[in-house]
Amino acid sequence: LPAFLAGGFLAAAFPVVYMMVKAEEMTALAGNPINILMSANWQMMAMLNILISICGACMMYHTEYADNGMQKMSVLPIRQGSMFFGKFLIAALVLSTMVVIEMAVLVGCAKYWFPSYVFDLTEILKTAGFQIIVTLPTVMLMLVIASACKNMWVSLGIGVILVFTLSILPQDNIVLSLFPFASPYQMLSAAVEN
């Protein structure tokens, strides 16, 4: 858990560093400060979220395959599906925590560098909820991949290849942007426009 929180703080540090370097350019732009900050930083933040989720999924299943833990658990009166759902719930909660940290930092940046910014909780909750929802299929697919591979490095390699392959897909094409490893790069403001 501390590694995931550290990853969330690392992703949240991007808008702060970016605004420290490019504050004049960014504050000169017209529009909603949260949308301005998201469009400038979300691609990198989303990639870090995905990579952290990939590592988490791989580690969850690696601990089960190590020392034949999967075989030992198969004799327990627990269905495999409920164990998968439990892992998905843990991964979703960790992802939600990371996104909440990142959104809090974005709000802090907006309040600090954009004096005219008015805090709107519903907008922040909608944006955070959207980012969590579009990332959950990626987390689910990565858990499926990790459960199918006994070797953690194989599932990690597959996940990283999928991240970098699908991140180059054009985001303006609605069909291509719905693929699980491409969807986390979507932003609510862009989705509303399309």
In which residue ranges do the predicted regions lie?
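Secretory targeting signals
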Residues: 4, 8-55, 85-150, 190, ...
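Pore- or pathway-lining transmembrane helices of multi-pass membrane proteins that form conduits
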Residues: 4-10, 150-167
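Hydrophobic alpha-helical segments typical of transmembrane helices
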Residues: 57, 68-69, 141, 180-183
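Helix-loop-helix units of permease transmembrane domains in multi-pass membrane transporters
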Residues: 60-92
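C-terminal halves and exits of single transmembrane alpha-helices
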Residues: 79-98, 171-179
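Terminal transmembrane helical anchor/hairpin motif
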Residues: 18-37, 156-194
